[in-house]
A protein has these predicted regions:
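Active-site-proximal binding-pocket segments
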Residues: 307-496
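Glycine-rich FAD pyrophosphate-binding loop
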Residues: 533-556
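N-terminal Rossmann-like FAD-binding beta1-loop-alpha1 element of flavoenzymes
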Residues: 514-541
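Beta-rich, aromatic/charged-enriched effector core domains that present basic-aromatic interfaces
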Residues: 33-37, 144, 149-271, 275, ...
């Protein structure tokens, strides 16, 4: 079958002469992959048969099971993850060439996992938009394409299944986690040959035989080669039509933007990081942004690139990270414009970082920075810090430093950070964390979590530069920094028009600022409200109670009498909430409850429960709700009686006094399911689902003894008894110790039977039951009071984390949507906030007014 380089118009060089000079692919040093001697002859012959411009970018990964059988007639699978394009894609071209020369089917496969670090709505939406473009482009080329989105019911190992019927796997060579570990896992799972192809760099990483630590040294070594490569057009392949594979383990699905919001909601990812409206994914969006920059920005790039308050940079890094545009094409275009400084950044600084990561195993560790930098930072590790900030404070832009907080706001709301500002942003971490290691972890976390170009070698280049990488010592030593180059925020702020920068970065995430009402200030409602507020939207909370928190409540009678009569403690198992928990602990909002927890059997036998980390808020459980409500507008003691939809697709709230509030673009209800229906004066999509769940009641008793009641334990689950739970409240961190305070919770069935009785009488009855179960010995209390929780225990919880009607703009959340615990409430609120933020990103669901002036590029 004939395969050749397509002929080019007269006067244009294909660059084959240049590529031929570089084909000594197997003589290059390998940090990973199989040695030449262990590869079978067919593997060497396969790469040797490739055109030189492709062969130089290839390297093999050999399985521990052996080099595999390249001669079998299985399909060629191209797994695309960091080259989401068909134009000038060396990895795709390699796969197409191999399939055509061997006359076997070719499949382009793209998967999107829930399990990569920092997986969020933001990254998922960007990648889904990229997948839609890639699917269209593959169809235009007549290539078979399959997409797999990991989510409940769709968590099979599709790629592993496809590899069983393949002869070779071709994939993008990307030098960082999680791709590196995924490829390694595939290498160990199968004997299938894996061919890695560099599609990210103009100068292939395989051509750089070591990690360079200074940009000038890298430039001196490779600039002449870059000068030869830059103007060369990418050779096009003249190949026969691709053969489509049959009997694949995955059906073809349409990657349709109308499905994205629902797909994303189903994924177990971080829904607190919303999509970025002004930066859509895909080759089409990349092309549009690049062409706009060529028309109106590149000529002024050198003069304006360092001013973070003006539109002076290309903002192409997210598209380069995921390979939605070819760096070869960008280099040619920039060279044609004579944009030397842009080429310096695109080629020298960016590809220096790629080569560094290619040759460095642990880029998340201080071992990645130069020895002099490690030494000086460790020497100054104990220097006094002005203040130590928890992750939550920094993530929300709450350092108190105006410039730094604006930088973080840009990351949080818009998924990007101006490169020059990133340098100052990163160095500030050293003075707000307890060690250089913690500063590095904080930089990596915040950058990768929020930035669309996070987890990229260029990102690591910028982050590690803040700690001395690619730099030299600066004398004299400074506190905390030592001889690492200083970059004070106050000095940088004097060079910036802060008012202009603030107007730009504080615009909301979305086409306009939405007004959102949250009815019910329980944990789910508070978490949703805070996420939406952090993304720049106007949120108002309404609650019939005196304060926030819902059932995460504390009754304070007097200084010595305090009872957590609602939620007793909480656990956090979900990885999406771990960072919040760690921050709350560091800030003193929560602390571990080290009390001994047991189970009391029907015969009175006491057995210890399985060990687990239980947490309580400090100095009382209600403090967690107050913490989440900080900075939010809360209308306490304002019960809402009606939610009324208007003709303009907005809604009004009417409270118990008849006062009207609104209009609101969205109304989120954090209420018991049976209370929601009567509020809604028009139907909505999910109203019928509320009949599938209910909140059962719970009667609580608050009891105090003058002296400690010694039981040998601090909390107990009581089996098959009217009292299902009892706890020594005084054993929790930060509680008053003058009196011995206890809380008893009744069984749901007993609570139903006695719900309308006097709560204080019920409390005394529960105390008698408890005394009977213990066989007597409970002392005479000095205080007994009851409380009726009419809505407490979900039975059952819905099999979804939130409810959302995009046509109405109405949503509902609560622990009854998830696990029935505090953790479930937090996840439910996060999920509903994600639905709203994705809705703002999806113009097909509701009409969106024209963008505000603040959304226009800065002039």
């Amino acid at each position: 079958m004939a395969c050749r380089i397509a002929k080019l118009p007269p006067g244009r060089s294909s660059g084959i002469e240049l590529w031929s000079e570089s084909i000594a692919i197997f003589s290059l040093a390998r940090r990973q992959g199989a040695a030449v001697g262990s590869l079978r002859m067919e593997a060497r012959e396969l790469v040797d048969s490739l055109p030189p411009h492709l062969a130089e970018r290839c390297r093999w990964m050999e399985s521990p099971r052996g080099p595999g059988d390249l001669m079998r007639s299985g399909i060629v699978v191209y797994w695309s993850h960091h080259a989401l394009r068909t134009a000038e894609n060396p990895a795709l071209d390699t796969a197409r060439w191999i399939a055509a020369t061997r006359n076997v089917p070719l499949l382009v496969y793209q998967g999107l996992s829930e399990r990569y670090h920092d997986a969020s709505d933001r990254h998922h939406r960007f990648l889904l938009e990229g997948a839609a473009d890639l699917q269209r482009q593959c169809r235009d080329l007549g290539l078979a394409y399959r997409f797999h989105l990991e989510r409940p019911g769709h968590r099979q190992q599709v790629l592993v299944e496809m590899m069983r019927n393949a002869s070779v796997l071709v994939t993008d060579d990307f030098p960082l986690a999680p791709t590196r570990s995924w490829v390694e896992r595939l290498r160990r799972l199968t004997s299938l040959p894996i061919l890695l192809v560099d599609a990210s760099c103009v100068l292939p990483m395989t051509r750089v035989t070591k990690a360079y630590t200074r940009a000038f040294a890298y430039r001196d070594a490779f600039w002449k080669e870059y000068q030869r490569r830059i103007p060369m057009p990418w050779p096009s392949l003249d190949l026969p039509a691709a053969i489509h594979p049959e009997n694949l383990p995955i059906e073809e699905i349409e990657v349709d933007s109308a499905k994205f919001s629902q797909w994303i909601a189903e994924c177990e990812i971080d829904h607190s990081v919303g999509p970025v409206l002004e930066t859509r994914g895909g080759s089409g969006a990349a092309e549009e942004r690049w062409e706009s920059f060529l028309r109106a920005g590149i000529d002024q790039y050198a003069a304006r690139r360092n001013d973070c308050a003006v539109a002076g940079v290309s903002r192409m890094s997210p598209y380069l990270h995921y390979g939605m545009i070819a760096p070869m094409r960008m280099a040619r275009d920039a060279d044609a414009r004579g944009a030397e400084k842009y080429l310096e950044e695109l080629l020298i600084w960016r590809e220096l970082a790629y080569a560094f990561c290619y040759h460095t195993e642990e880029v998340d560790d201080l071992s990645a920075i130069p020895e002099w930098a490690r030494k000086t930072l460790m020497e100054h590790q104990r220097d006094a810090r002005e203040s130590i900030h928890a992750w939550e404070s920094l993530a929300r832009g709450g350092s108190g430093d105006r410039l730094w907080d604006l930088a973080q706001c840009s990351l949080l709301r818009h998924g990007e950070l101006h490169n020059n500002l990133r340098m100052t942003w990163g160095k500030a971490m050293l003075q707000w964390t307890r060690s250089p290691e913690e500063a590095l972890r904080m930089m990596v976390d915040l950058n990768h979590r929020y930035a669309l170009d996070g987890r990229d070698p260029a990102s690591y280049g910028g982050i590690l530069w803040c700690l001395g990488q690619f730099d030299r010592p600066f004398e004299p030593p400074q506190p905390i920094l030592g001889t690492v180059r200083p970059r004070p925020t106050d000095e940088h702020a004097r060079r910036v028009d802060l008012k202009r920068l603030e107007r730009h970065v504080k615009r909301p995430a979305g086409a306009r600022r939405w007004r959102v009402a949250v009815v019910g200030a329980g944990l789910a409602g508070l978490h949703a409200a805070r996420i939406l507020s952090d993304h720049g939207h106007e949120v108002e909370l309404f609650d019939k109670g005196r304060g926030p928190g819902g059932r995460v409540a504390t009754r304070r009678i007097e200084e010595a009498l305090q009872f957590d009569h609602g939620a007793q403690y909480f656990t956090i198992r979900d990885r999406r909430l771990v960072r919040l928990l760690q921050s709350w602990h560091q800030m003193g909002v929560v602390a571990p409850w080290e009390g001994k927890i047991v189970s009391i059997q029907t015969d009175g036998t006491v057995t210890p429960t399985e060990p687990m980390q239980r947490w309580v808020a400090v100095p009382r459980m209600s403090q967690l709700g107050r913490h989440l409500a900080e900075g939010l507008q809360l209308h306490a003691q304002t019960p809402i009686s009606q939610v009324v939809a208007q003709d303009d697709m907005q809604s009004m709230l009417i409270d118990g006094k008849g006062d009207r509030h609104g209009p609101f673009d969205a109304v989120l209800l954090n209420l018991p399911p049976r209370q929601i229906g009567p509020l809604l004066k028009q139907p909505c999509q999910w109203l019928g689902m509320l009949e599938q769940t209910q909140l059962l009641p719970c009667l609580a008793a608050m009891v105090a003894f003058a002296e400690p009641f010694e039981t040998g334990w601090d909390g107990a689950f009581v089996q098959e008894h009217p009292v299902r739970w009892v706890a020594r409240d005084s054993s929790k961190v930060g509680r008053p110790k003058k009196l011995d305070c206890w809380v008893l919770h009744a069984d749901a069935n007993w609570s139903i039977d006695h719900l309308e009785e006097d709560p204080d009488q019920s409390a005394r009855q529960l105390l008698r039951y408890w005394n009977d179960r213990l066989g007597g010995g409970v002392p005479e209390p000095i205080f007994v009071q009851g409380h009726r929780w009419r809505y407490s225990i979900p039975s059952p919880s819905l099999d979804c984390q939130s409810l959302w009607d995009p046509a109405r703009g109405w949503g509902a959340c609560g622990d009854w949507c998830a696990s029935g615990r505090m953790e479930g409430a937090l996840l439910s609120g996060m999920a509903l906030a994600g639905r709203v933020l994705n809705h703002l990103h999806d113009p097909s669901l509701r009409p969106t007014p024209p963008p505000q002036q603040a959304l226009l590029p800065l002039q």
